[in-house]
Every structure is written in C-alpha cells, then in structure tokens.
C-alpha cells in the first residue's frame, strides 16, 4: 500500500520511476478531475508537472485495464480518452502484443482518427462539432494537436451544459463563466474547451485555410438535420413579427454565401436569400414558407432550452 502523500516523502524521488515506486498511481490519477488539479497536486507533492502527468496518464490506463502490464500502460497512455482505450483493447489483443508493436499501433490509431473521426466520435458528437463550427465555435491548435472551443452568452448556460454533456468523453479542460469588456460594455459568457486530441486535427483541416475558417462543399456535404439544428441554435435568429429565420453568417464572404445558398436548395429544397447589412456583413434569410419547412427538418434535434430560436417557448 502506498505511503501517505507528503512533501517530505517525495523529496528523494527522481523521475517517473520514483513516482511509480512511491505511490499508487491509479489513486493519483483519480485526483486530477479538472483544469488546474494537476498543478495543485504537483505543488503539493513537489513533483514536476510533466513527470506527474505521465504517472497520472499511466494510472488512468491501469484503472481501465487492471491486468495490463505496467510497461504497456505508459504506451497506451497515448490514447487520450477512455472510450478509445476500450475500442483499441477490443481491436487488438493487447495482452499478447509486444510493447514495441503497441507503440506502432497507438501511433497508427492516432493517425487514423485524424482521417476518419467516426472511428472514435459518435455520429451525435460529430454533428455537434460540425454544427457548432459552422457557427462561432473554433478549433485551436496547440503544438501538434487541436482542441475544440466555444463560447456562449450566459443566457445560453443550459445549452452550453447540454453541449458539454455530449462532449464529456473528450476531457473538458475549461467550462467557466467569464466577463469580457467590449467597447463600453461587459459581456457575460460561458467559455468551454476540450483538451487537445488528434481527432480534432480532422476538423481543423476541414474548416480552416491559412488560419481562417472558410466554407466549402466538403464541409457542407456533412451537414444533416442534426448538425443543421446546432447551427441554427448557434447562429440563428427568429424574427417574431414576420415569422422568418435569419442565419447570422457574418464572418463569411459573398462567394461562401452563394455556396451555402446553393447547398440549402440542393440538400433541403430551401431557397434562402442573401442579405447585406452595415456595408460589410452578409447573412442568410429564410422566407416564411422556407422557415416553416426548416423548422420541420430541425425541430426534433433542438434542445428545449433553445426553442426560442424557432419561435417557440422554452417549456
């Protein structure tokens, strides 16, 4: 049984092997649940964050696969989510596979999910990411991998929680209320971010060129009723008096709006008009008839907290 944690007992430890010998790393891994926990524990135990992080990653694997050899746990720690550890363990016989072979297989897996995300993400998660990225969500690059981020008004806190629940598999690094000063006023918002993962590299490549988010047929072709519903929740606005929906697609240029207009006509039989305001912003507006058809397409996928986006009360 591991000794009680203390600064005195940790001073003699040297590197990862010392942490393995001194502590139950499975129990250590359970102590890190949110952003900041690793640093606090590192300071408490006087262990370098990088070394402690490696130990905690191994502990997570040993917690999921108690019978796995400890030498293989460090290799499998390259699989960042619990789900993919289980998928990987089912796909390969990890008990008899050599450590050298496992290194290659883990590297291969991380390359594969960057090309085919549905090896790991569910269709519902994929649709949420696609729909959100059509709106104001972003993919941020950090070193070689990326993370998924969004920010919503505090009025959409329930919607933010709903998204967070759907994406909990991807190790949430941030979910917090913030206040930002924009010009002479403050905006109260919810900021969300996952930890980095190779699978988000796929979405970065799909949506970005030269660090700018763009619209192209490849991404539009992935839109279905569920991802479209998320897009409407993020960027849609219902005009109550006249009964139509506007998509506030301000960050895209005219050619991209023409592409979106063509897509809606071909995929959903809708014919939005391209609007222009303030001398610089384009948007899409659905006429009353098309708005009714659009609502029929997406309503079953709209969270109740966002029913106002389609002109209904949030019951």
Say what each PLM segment does:
Residues 39-43, 50, 157, 161-165:
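N-terminal, well-ordered alpha-helical segments
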Residues 4-8, 28, 38, 112-123:
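General secondary-structure propensity
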Residues 31-40, 44-48, 55-113:
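Amphipathic alpha-helical oligomerization/scaffolding segments
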Residues 1-3, 314-315:
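Short, Lys/Arg-enriched, disordered terminal segments
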Residues 16, 38, 85, 216, ...:
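Generic structural marker for isolated residues within well-ordered, non-membrane alpha-helices
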Residues 20-29:
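Short, Lys/Arg-enriched anionic-surface-contact patches
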Residues 2-20:
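P-loop NTPase nucleotide-binding/switch module
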Residues 110-315:
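Internal intein/HINT superfamily modules and their associated LAGLIDADG
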